């Protein structure tokens, strides 16, 4: 038996999200009140990689955490906007970069027990430099560093943003598998 929703009401709403409270029957048969957030945007993040194997991180103060955060360039795509176009916009606005090649790397749910938010991550290559176009709420520092160093930042906890950390760890795993395959030591399926 899965979850069964009996009633749902809006507790709070703004331009970016709706907070709902539902009366539900849980999988064990108990009655509960379940609060959750429905986002009106899709999160898009970009892993830019230049011809020298470097990437860009953006650093900014995150109000909800009251701390500084290093993360991939990212933002929100309204549900009716093409996520790739939003990713291109965010990369240009936050770093000044444009890219000639784009590839979707993955989709994930950053916090699936409390929200329906979807995150889409793209890899951007064929980079060209330009000017940033920051919004009034953005006070961003751009850091250019080797991709391997960004991966280390995710591994050692200096990057805590879920989309950024998941992306960098996934890239590290793919690189490790590729190195294993090239060395002829790939695991054999049982």
List each language-model region with its residue ranges.
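A short, amphipathic edge element
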Residues: 1-9
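Conserved Nudix-box catalytic region and its N-terminal flanking loop in Nudix hydrolases
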Residues: 2, 37-40, 44-89, 190
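Hydrophobic residues on conserved beta-strands that form the core of alpha/beta folds
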Residues: 5, 19, 33-34, 58, ...
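Acidic, metal-coordinating catalytic segment for phosphate/diphosphate chemistry
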Residues: 9-45, 50-51
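Acidic pyrophosphate-coordinating catalytic loop
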Residues: 10-14, 63, 108-120, 176
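Active-site/binding-pocket entry motifs
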Residues: 25, 63, 128-129
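Unchanged
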Residues: 33, 42-45, 50, 75-163
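Long hydrophobic alpha-helical segments typical of transmembrane helices together
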Residues: 151-190
């Amino acid at each position: 038996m899965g979850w069964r929703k009996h009633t749902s009401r809006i507790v709070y709403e703004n331009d970016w999200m709706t907070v709902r409270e539902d009366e539900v029957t849980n999988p064990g048969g108990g009655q509960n009140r379940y609060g959750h957030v429905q986002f009106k945007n899709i999160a898009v993040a970009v892993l830019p990689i230049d011809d020298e194997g470097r990437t860009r991180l953006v650093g900014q103060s995150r109000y909800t955490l009251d701390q500084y955060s290093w993360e991939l360039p990212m933002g929100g795509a309204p549900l009716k906007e093409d996520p790739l176009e939003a990713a291109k916009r965010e990369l240009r606005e936050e770093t000044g970069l444009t890219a000639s090649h784009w590839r979707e790397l993955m989709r994930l749910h950053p916090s699936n027990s409390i929200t329906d938010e979807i995150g889409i991550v793209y890899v951007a290559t064929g980079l060209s430099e330009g000017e940033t176009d920051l919004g009034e709420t953005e006070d961003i520092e751009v850091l250019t560093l080797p991709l391997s160093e960004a991966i280390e930042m995710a591994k050692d906890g200096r990057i805590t943003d879920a989309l950024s950390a998941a992306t960098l760890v996934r890239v590290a795993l793919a690189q490790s598998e590729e190195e294993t395959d090239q060395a002829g030591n790939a695991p054999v399926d049982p």
